Regions:
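A structural motif shared across PLP-dependent enzymes of the aminotransferase-like
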Residues: 1-7, 101, 199
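N-terminal Rossmann-like NAD(P)+-binding subdomain of aldehyde/semialdehyde dehydrogenases
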Residues: 4, 12-13
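Basic, alpha-helical helix-turn-helix
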Residues: 9-10, 28
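PLP-dependent class I/II
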Residues: 15-19, 23-323
Length: 323
């Protein structure tokens, strides 16, 4: 499987690695967690742009580090800016996490944006970079994916994580992998050898076939996701009180419900909003505050168009009841 991963990075990202620069874990989560356990000491800070995937902060805390959040609002497309990154870095900063395309927002960094962030990091040589690329192949509108390890001078301190769950719909097979500096990969290997050992050999064999096989279906599937995204975003923006940016990747949207909070009902925040939506209309979404940004909620459109149409009608009815 390491050979398949090496070929993937060379084929798709023009990155060259050797087998001692590759780790394979029981899902991307284990790879991330092992990396933090291997590198964090008490007091070390990990910069986490918010909104963020919910597991990042707890992984850092479990490893003895300190999560430091950088608010990236709707006005910035939910993306980190060089100015905010520069301001957040201190002598205690050990890692910066970059996730593109993003869970929960679907925001994706362009090559130009990645290079701009890279210029800040080039000046801060003690900061490691964790690039979570798990949604690399779920992208739309001819978006050109670029990962920060492609900046030559940053490659040696970048850990690039990916996996088969999102690209190949193999979530339950639990195969994640990463490429990075030999010393960090070796430390990750030590931790994994004393905890879970190797991932399932059956899953490894399946992942090899996925990585080495034809990739043509990925674009076809992205078209289906794109159609659902367009429908959901356009419908949400037609609902008074709701606004929603058009994401460039992943299979989530992150609409604002600020215009519906504090109206004639007792809904005071996004948590109240999603709770009442579930109670009144049986639609399950996740509050933005769970991802570090209040006043929003996340919808996954990784389901059928039929179910999405029903959900949108129910969300509209619920929102109208709050006006």
């Amino acid at each position: 499987i390491k050979n398949a991963v090496i070929k993937k990075f060379k084929r798709e990202n023009k990155l060259n690695y050797t087998s001692d620069q590759i780790t394979v874990g029981t899902g991307g989560k284990q790879v991330l967690y092992n990396a933090f356990v291997a590198t964090l000491n008490k007091g070390d800070e990990v910069l986490i742009p918010a909104p963020f995937w919910v597991s990042y902060p707890d992984m850092v805390l479990l490893a003895g580090g300190k999560p430091k959040f950088i608010k990236c609002g709707e006005e910035d497309g939910f993306k980190l800016t060089p100015a905010k990154l520069k301001k957040a870095i201190t002598k205690k900063t050990k890692w910066i996490i970059l996730n593109s395309p993003s869970n929960p927002t679907g925001a994706a960094y362009t090559k130009k944006e990645i290079i701009s962030l890279g210029k800040v990091l080039l000046k801060n040589k003690n900061v490691f970079i964790l690039s979570d690329d798990i949604y690399e192949h779920v992208k739309f509108d001819n978006f050109k994916f670029f990962t920060i390890a492609q900046i030559k001078k940053l490659k040696d301190r970048t850990l690039t994580m990916n996996g088969v769950s999102k690209a190949y719909a193999m979530t339950g097979w639990r195969i994640g992998y990463a490429a990075g500096p030999k010393n960090i990969i070796a430390a990750i290997r030590k931790i994994q050898s004393q905890s879970t050992s190797n991932p399932s050999s059956i899953s490894q064999a399946a992942a090899v076939e996925a990585l080495n096989g034809t990739q043509s279906f990925i674009k076809k599937r992205a078209k289906s996701f794109s159609d659902r995204r367009n429908f959901v975003v356009n419908y949400l923006n037609s609902i008074p009180g709701i606004t929603c940016l058009m994401p460039k990747g992943a299979f989530y949207v992150f609409p604002s419900c600020k215009g519906l909070i504090g109206k004639k009902t007792k809904i005071k925040n996004d948590t109240d909003f999603v709770q009442k939506l579930l109670e009144k209309q049986n639609v399950a979404v996740v509050q933005g505050s769970a991802f570090g940004l209040d006043g929003y909620f996340r919808i996954s459109y990784a389901t059928s168009m039929q179910k999405l149409k029903v959900a949108m009608v129910r969300i509209k009815l619920f929102c109208e009841s709050l006006g």
